[in-house]
């Protein structure tokens, strides 16, 4: 419990907790917590401390305190409703957690109120803590008061206060002042069993000292705070009537019944050691529901969900004045007859201390002696039904099993003979049978899904949709209705002895409640064969979607639609007696028999498959037959089998055969028929219900979620909870009568659980772990079902903390799918004993696969080429030429490889020659300007340009002279008809016309260039691949002009041409060709 306490403290003192989330959680908790113990016959003895704690009226808020309580506590003023309770300083004692671990200290800063402030009447004022207190409580707008324990104790340095009520509401007596009495006290709630829960789980603390850390119970789901007092402390019940005769109740329409007068115990009674009273105040603002009556429950402690509850103390033998809360002075108190009193108000509380088994909690009603409970608000989330928990021995740390969002617990007596007078002693535990759930408002859409004829869809406990035949569904319902009425233990609906409880809850807006969609369940009562006491079991129910109301008790409607969930609770499951071991041993034997059958049939199939000879197959069959008939034993069988099949010995085979052969010989009387059946067809898969056993152990660690508004599920588990999810509806069975239900082999530790994939509608907070121990229900018959195909509907939002769950679910689903495909069917245990049948049969799988893959087995080991060899030269002319040359040397025949070799040699020679010629030709394009090692000595190109310019100038000068002569001749006015003169004139006119035409052409060109725009010159600063010594190869081709927008400008590709001079240069430099005939022929060309 120490580890769980630390985890709870970590959640509670996390500074990142959103105030609104916590407020909503408290609102949801209070709507689901009802005043427990209001429907018992007896009141346990009350102490003055209890009366003082209950006398202080607390408003609608829970005040949180530091785990190390305040050092000094001022005395509580006497409450108005309890005149006889004198205030006394609290007892000093060292605070320690319930499990004995170190408690994490809280921050010294003032805490925020954990409940939203609502309009509530100021019932009392909160006194600030005195000097030296470790943590201060922040006042809340609604009235709140905490009363200190009245037992005196010597002062100690910085020790927490004694047990004080976390929150208590007490209505005053029928005096003139109808308001609750002011009970000022130190501002630090403390109690020995107070536990911090923030998330809808139930916590059970065991206190070895009189004082424990003061903590708050904040919950969004139904939960109960069950503190276990010191073993020597007598049981105490505090049941305060909520606002009996209050001045201004927050529920507007519900009137307050008058307070019930009850004689109070004398104030001088010596106070026994204080137990752990804890009270939860409910914030106002939720409407009241229809009133119903509450059943009387024989177990010693109970906490029920619900809305407002009204309770008044029963009359005790002692005489006294009227008090709002009165206790009974002695342990042997008389029983109070229940009477129907109804009060429908929103505020409610749970004040409960779990006593030793010798005393019984009871509750009293507001109208004189009344034991009735009205629990009415509507529900908008998931509502788990109460789960019964037998109390462990005092002094042992115990954890409560965690439900969907936390379970309201009922402490059922495991020793019914120890009940006091007036309580009917019965061995039958309380049977809670919920009604059928109403369909949710938002049904799940399943698109493109065709249901086979005769099948129906039901929703399982995990939120999955399962396909079940209609006949099976009808059998489930008929079986559920056909159970005997004595096993149902129905409670009469009349409010005389055991009125039913109607439980509803209101979810605050924005409160995240983890909704699991399941169908209602019934209870499997399991009887311990080695013990006389009945192990009480209860149902863990999660309602689907939005379910308005759920009736517990009354006429139990056991006909259901889907799978039933039975949660085995109570003491750790190691106490389940010897039937478990025998059943599990039988199951293991059957599993071994099945695997041995598969092994032998596979052996026969492999031997007779054609790979082996017929003689080997016959010998293997004879060996198997002799083994089944008992003629030979396992050692002889395996040795002869190894010799027959030439296989390596298997060390696990002999022990496996020894374990499974006796049962196999009993189940297989006819060995010849078994061998024949193995040869004909593979063994049919055994029909198994794959959803029979789902071990879902709720993790004890705190699952932290990423978002602030996501709800978390935490609980401190001591015994693991095994949830037996069954594909059939299981009715309530008789005690001692085995319940018909489908049983699978329990998963051994370390094996893979193969349940259907867990699909949750909210953040998946359930961790799949291996159970520490196994529960087997002995069954006279087994219902064989076809494997149900789960249809997952909601894809869970996987958070960082749930990757392991997703991985386990995926692996389980894949393994289950593979197992169902196998001919022998899937088992829940790894086949580690015998898993290599092929090697035992002498089949080498690697050789077989190699033979299958090798299409041409004759080519194995030879050189294979991926492509056909192609010759460079034509085969026929080359062969003819080679034969012509060979005739001179006496060669008449030629191998085809010779032609190929000569062709390849020719190709290689030409390739080398072309490479050399290319290198030679590239040297002509080598630019020495770019090399820094060279300087330009002469510019031949510039000299040539200069000579060209000289020639051009000379020609221009001659043209000018001729033109000048022509112009002079044209201008002459001589009248002589000289033919030479006429010729010159004509030539001058043509020259002028030609000049005019040239001028027009030049003007037109300039105009066109101006219209086109300036030319973009190529940049030469970044040389491309074609510049320099490159460009001769045929592979690199770069376009001559560069694009306009390209960032890199390429220069024009320079093409290197290889000419005959380059070839001659190469032939001259080679030794082989420097004096060859080919070189001289090249010179001649």
From Swiss-Prot:
Protein name: Transcription initiation factor TFIID subunit 4
Disease: Intellectual developmental disorder, autosomal dominant 73: An autosomal dominant disorder characterized by intellectual disability ranging from mild to severe, developmental delay, speech delay, behavioral abnormalities, and non-specific dysmorphic facial features.
Domain of life: Eukaryota
Record-linked CDD domains: HFD_TAF4
Record field: compositional bias (Polar residues): 408-425
Function: The TFIID basal transcription factor complex plays a major role in the initiation of RNA polymerase II (Pol II)-dependent transcription. TFIID recognizes and binds promoters with or without a TATA box via its subunit TBP, a TATA-box-binding protein, and promotes assembly of the pre-initiation complex (PIC). The TFIID complex consists of TBP and TBP-associated factors (TAFs), including TAF1, TAF2, TAF3, TAF4, TAF5, TAF6, TAF7, TAF8, TAF9, TAF10, TAF11, TAF12 and TAF13.
Modified residues (Asymmetric dimethylarginine): 424, 435
Modified residues (N6,N6-dimethyllysine): 594-595, 597, 605, 611, 621, 631, 658
Oligomeric form and interacting partners: Component of the TFIID basal transcription factor complex, composed of TATA-box-binding protein TBP, and a number of TBP-associated factors (TAFs), including TAF1, TAF2, TAF3, TAF4, TAF5, TAF6, TAF7, TAF8, TAF9, TAF10, TAF11, TAF12 and TAF13. Component of the TFTC-HAT complex, at least composed of TAF5L, TAF6L, TADA3L, SUPT3H, TAF2, TAF4, TAF5, GCN5L2/GCN5, TAF10, TAF12 and TRRAP.
């Amino acid at each position: 419990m120490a580890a769980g306490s630390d985890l709870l403290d970590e959640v509670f003192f996390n500074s990142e907790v959103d105030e609104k989330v916590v407020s909503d959680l408290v609102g949801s908790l209070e709507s689901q917590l009802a005043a427990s113990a209001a429907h018992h016959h007896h009141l346990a003895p009350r102490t003055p401390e209890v009366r003082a704690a209950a006398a202080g009226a607390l408003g609608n808020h829970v005040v949180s305190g530091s785990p190390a309580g305040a050092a000094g506590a001022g005395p509580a003023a006497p409450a108005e409703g309890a005149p006889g309770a004198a205030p006394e300083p609290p007892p000093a004692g060292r605070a320690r957690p319930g499990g004995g671990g170190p408690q994490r200290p809280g921050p010294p800063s003032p805490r925020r109120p954990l409940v939203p402030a609502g309009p509530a009447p100021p019932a009392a004022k909160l006194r600030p803590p005195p000097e030296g207190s470790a943590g201060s409580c922040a006042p809340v707008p609604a009235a709140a008061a905490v009363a200190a324990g009245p037992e005196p104790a010597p002062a100690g340095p910085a020790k927490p206060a004694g047990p004080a009520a976390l929150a208590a509401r007490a209505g005053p007596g029928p005096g003139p002042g109808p308001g609750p009495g002011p009970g000022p006290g130190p501002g630090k709630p403390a109690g020995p069993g107070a536990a911090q829960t923030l998330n809808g789980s139930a916590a059970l603390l065991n206190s070895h000292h009189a004082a424990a850390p003061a903590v708050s119970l904040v919950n969004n789901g139904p939960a109960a705070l069950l503190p276990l007092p010191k073993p020597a402390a007598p049981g105490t019940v505090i049941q305060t009537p909520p606002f009996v005769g209050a001045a201004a109740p927050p529920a507007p329409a519900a009137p307050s019944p008058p307070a019930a007068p009850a004689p109070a115990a004398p104030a001088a009674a010596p106070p026994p050691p204080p137990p752990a009273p804890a009270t939860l105040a409910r914030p106002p603002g939720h409407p009241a529901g229809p009133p119903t009556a509450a059943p009387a429950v024989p177990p010693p402690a109970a906490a029920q969900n619900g809305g407002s509850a009204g309770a008044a103390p029963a009359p005790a033998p002692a005489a006294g004045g009227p008090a709002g809360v009165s206790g009974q002075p002695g342990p042997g108190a008389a029983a109070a007859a229940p009477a129907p009193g109804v009060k429908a108000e929103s505020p409610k509380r749970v004040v409960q201390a779990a006593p030793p088994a010798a005393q019984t909690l009871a509750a009293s009603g507001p109208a004189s002696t009344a034991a009735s409970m009205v629990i009415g608000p509507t529900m908008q989330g998931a509502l788990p039904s109460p789960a019964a928990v037998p109390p462990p021995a005092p002094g042992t740390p115990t954890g409560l099993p965690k439900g969907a969002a936390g379970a309201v617990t009922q402490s059922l007596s495991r020793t019914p003979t120890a009940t006091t007078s007036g309580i009917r002693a019965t061995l039958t535990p309380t049977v809670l049978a919920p009604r059928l759930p109403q369909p949710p408002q938002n049904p799940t859409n399943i698109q493109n899904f065709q249901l086979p004829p005769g099948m129906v869809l039901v929703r399982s406990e995990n939120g999955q949709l399962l396909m079940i035949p209609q006949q099976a569904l009808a059998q489930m319902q008929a079986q559920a209705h056909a159970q005997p009425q004595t096993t149902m233990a129905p409670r009469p609906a009349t409010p005389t002895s055991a009125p039913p409880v109607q439980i509803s809850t209101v979810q605050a807006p924005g409160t995240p409640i983890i909704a699991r969609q399941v169908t209602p369940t019934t209870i499997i009562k399991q009887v311990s064969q080695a013990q006389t006491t009945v192990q009480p079991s209860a149902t863990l129910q999660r309602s689907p979607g939005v379910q308005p109301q759920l009736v517990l008790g009354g006429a139990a409607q056991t006909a259901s639609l889907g799978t039933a969930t039975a949660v085995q609770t109570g003491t750790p499951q190691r106490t389940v007696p010897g039937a478990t071991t025998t059943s599990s041993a039988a199951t293991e034997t059957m599993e071994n028999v099945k695997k041995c059958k598969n092994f032998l049939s596979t052996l026969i199939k492999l031997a007779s498959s054609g790979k082996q000879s017929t003689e080997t197959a016959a010998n293997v069959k004879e060996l198997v037959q002799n083994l089944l008939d008992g003629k030979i034993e396992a050692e002889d069988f395996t040795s002869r089998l190894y010799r027959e099949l030439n296989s390596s010995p298997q060390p696990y085979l002999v022990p496996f055969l020894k374990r499974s052969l006796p049962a196999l010989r009993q189940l297989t009387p006819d060995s010849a028929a078994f061998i024949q059946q193995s040869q004909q067809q593979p063994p049919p898969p055994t029909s198994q219900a794959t959803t029979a056993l789902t071990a879902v152990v709720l993790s004890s660690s705190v699952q932290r979620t990423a978002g602030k508004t996501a709800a978390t599920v935490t609980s401190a588990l001591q015994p693991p909870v095994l949830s037996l999810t069954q594909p059939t509806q299981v009715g309530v069975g008789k005690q001692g009568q085995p319940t018909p239900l489908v049983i699978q082999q329990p998963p051994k530790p370390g094996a893979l659980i193969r349940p259907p994939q867990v699909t949750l509608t909210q953040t998946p907070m359930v961790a799949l772990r291996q159970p520490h121990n196994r529960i087997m229900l002995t069954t006279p018959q087994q219902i064989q079902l076809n494997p149900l195909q789960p249809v997952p509907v909601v894809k869970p939002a996987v958070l960082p903390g749930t990757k392991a769950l997703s991985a386990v679910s995926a692996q389980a689903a894949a393994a289950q799918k593979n197992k169902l495909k196998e001919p022998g069917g899937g088992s829940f245990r790894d086949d580690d004993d015998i898993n290599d049948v092929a090697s035992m049969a002498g089949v080498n799988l690697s050789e077989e696969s190699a033979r299958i893959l090798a299409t041409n087995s004759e080519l194995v080991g030879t050189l294979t080429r991926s492509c056909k060899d192609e010759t460079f030269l034509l085969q026929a002319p080359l062969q003819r030429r080679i034969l012509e040359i060979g005739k001179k040397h006496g060669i008449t025949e030629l191998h085809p490889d010779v032609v190929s070799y000569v062709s390849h040699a020719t190709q290689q020679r030409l390739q080398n020659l072309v490479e050399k010629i290319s290198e030679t030709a590239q040297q002509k394009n080598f630019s020495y300007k770019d090399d820094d090692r060279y300087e330009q000595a002469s510019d031949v190109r510039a000299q040539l340009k200069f000579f060209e310019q000289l020639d051009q100038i000379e020609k221009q000068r001659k043209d000018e002279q001729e033109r000048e002569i022509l112009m002079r001749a044209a201008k002459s006015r001589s009248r002589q008809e000289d033919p030479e003169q006429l010729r010159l004139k004509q030539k001058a006119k043509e020259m002028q016309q030609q000049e005019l035409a040239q001028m027009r052409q030049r003007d037109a060109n300039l105009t066109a260039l101006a219209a086109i725009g300036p030319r973009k010159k190529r940049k030469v600063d970044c040389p491309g691949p074609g510049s320099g010594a490159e460009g001769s190869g045929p592979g690199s081709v770069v376009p001559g002009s560069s694009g306009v927008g390209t960032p890199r400008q390429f220069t024009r590709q320079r093409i290197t041409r290889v000419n005959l001079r380059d070839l001659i240069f190469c032939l001259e430099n080679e030794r082989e060709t420097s004096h060859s005939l080919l070189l001289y022929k090249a010179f001649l060309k």
